[in-house]
């Protein structure tokens, strides 16, 4: 049904160490011509080398992209770099990094991941996500602009959209701005 609706990819995920449990699901998705993006949740459960080994198994079973998930938001920038570096040395598919802001380090972790070769940085508008949130998209864009990257993304239009459309829509639905700041 997803393929009939023009879905181009589906994201699968499991806790680090449980990747083999999704091989069959990935194969079924691929049979329908849909790309598989895989989330290595709670990546810190394994060493960088063990996670890279799991990513290689996923790649061998047709996964098109893997994302290292700092699910608890407790990694440090050096950890982010080590995980990305280990995966980039082991697989040919794109490697992403997803970080939470529980320690206030999402920007530092994202920069470290990017410096060590991450192809994709997950982020959320206004940092929206569970717990203390994710790397805010607007911050990611600003940081990339400082490096001369992602210049096709208009930061000011993004900020205008958030201010004029997203925040009012959220408040209309009862989502208060202070909840955004404290992660309720």
Language model: regions and residue ranges:
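Catalytic cores and adjacent flexible loops of soluble metabolic enzymes
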Residues: 1-184
């Amino acid at each position: 049904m997803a393929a009939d609706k023009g879905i181009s990819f589906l994201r699968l995920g499991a806790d680090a160490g449980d990747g083999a449990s999704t091989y069959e699901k990935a194969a079924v998705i691929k049979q329908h011509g849909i790309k598989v993006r895989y989330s290595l949740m709670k990546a810190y459960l394994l060493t960088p080398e063990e996670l890279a080994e799991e990513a290689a198994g996923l790649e061998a079973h047709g996964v098109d992209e893997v994302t290292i998930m700092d699910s608890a938001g407790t990694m440090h920038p050096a950890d982010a770099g080590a995980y990305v570096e280990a995966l980039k040395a082991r697989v040919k598919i794109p490697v992403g990094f997803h970080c939470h802001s529980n320690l206030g380090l999402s920007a530092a972790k994202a920069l470290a991941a990017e410096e060590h070769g991450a192809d994709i940085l997950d982020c959320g508008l206004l940092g929206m996500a569970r717990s203390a949130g994710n790397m805010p998209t607007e911050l990611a864009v600003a940081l990339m602009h400082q490096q001369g990257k992602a210049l096709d993304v208009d930061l000011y239009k993004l900020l205008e959209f958030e201010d004029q459309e997203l925040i009012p829509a959220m408040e209309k639905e009862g989502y208060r701005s202070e909840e955004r700041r404290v992660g309720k």
